């Protein structure tokens, strides 16, 4: 039976910039002992830990022992075209991913935004394995939720939770109206309609996974 472990990497959040912000200039396959990452999330599949973070097209690393990390290719080979077309100022620097194993697939949620604005979107992609050597690509399904300048919320920093009845929810947000909670569809590709947002923190706060 496949065992999967998800761990919130709050301790790594303090290690800003570094490899995650060097983008395509970082040599893939290089082994490092102290990867500097921003907004990390980690999952374990089999005997390997996989770390994803803010970076160009979502940075990724893998490790067998949580000590030595191999720099892997970015999740996407190019910025999602739907995000480039719909979010002015977005050029592929993708923020604050979240990972969840759900109904046979790994689901990746990621943030696309223009810095300092709430013209943003949270995207979704899925894959059956986290193994970067697999021939199976991430299948991107596009935007889960979008925020515009007229909205009092910011569609970034997603975190997925499953309630006691098995229903999927997403917390997200940063500044503006604070942290929001919204129900997702069973396939996790969009918000449940009619869409209803619940504000769970109204201060200028970010980090929905902390709530």
Language-model features: locations:
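Carbohydrate-active catalytic/glycan-binding domains of CAZyme proteins
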Residues: 19-211
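Bacterial Sec-dependent N-terminal signal peptides
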Residues: 1-23
């Amino acid at each position: 039976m496949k065992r999967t472990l998800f761990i919130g990497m709050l301790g790594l959040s303090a290690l800003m910039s570094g490899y995650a912000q060097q983008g395509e200039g970082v040599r893939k396959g290089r082994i490092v002992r102290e990867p500097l990452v921003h907004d990390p999330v980690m999952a374990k599949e089999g005997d390997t830990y996989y770390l994803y973070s803010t970076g160009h097209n979502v940075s990724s690393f893998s490790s067998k022992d949580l000590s030595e990390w191999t720099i892997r290719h970015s999740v996407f080979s190019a910025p999602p075209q739907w995000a480039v077309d719909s979010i002015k100022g977005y050029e592929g620097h993708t923020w604050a991913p979240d990972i969840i194993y759900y109904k046979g697939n790994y689901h990746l949620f990621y943030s696309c935004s223009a810095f300092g604005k709430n013209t943003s979107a949270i995207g979704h992609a899925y894959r059956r394995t986290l193994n970067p050597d697999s021939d199976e690509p991430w299948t991107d399904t596009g935007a889960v939720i979008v925020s515009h300048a007229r909205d009092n919320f910011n569609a970034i920093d997603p975190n997925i939770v499953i309630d006691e009845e098995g229903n999927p929810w997403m917390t997200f947000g940063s500044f503006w109206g604070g942290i929001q909670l919204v129900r997702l569809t069973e396939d996790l590709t969009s918000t449940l309609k009619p869409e209803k947002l619940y504000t769970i923190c109204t201060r200028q706060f970010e980090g929905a996974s902390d709530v």
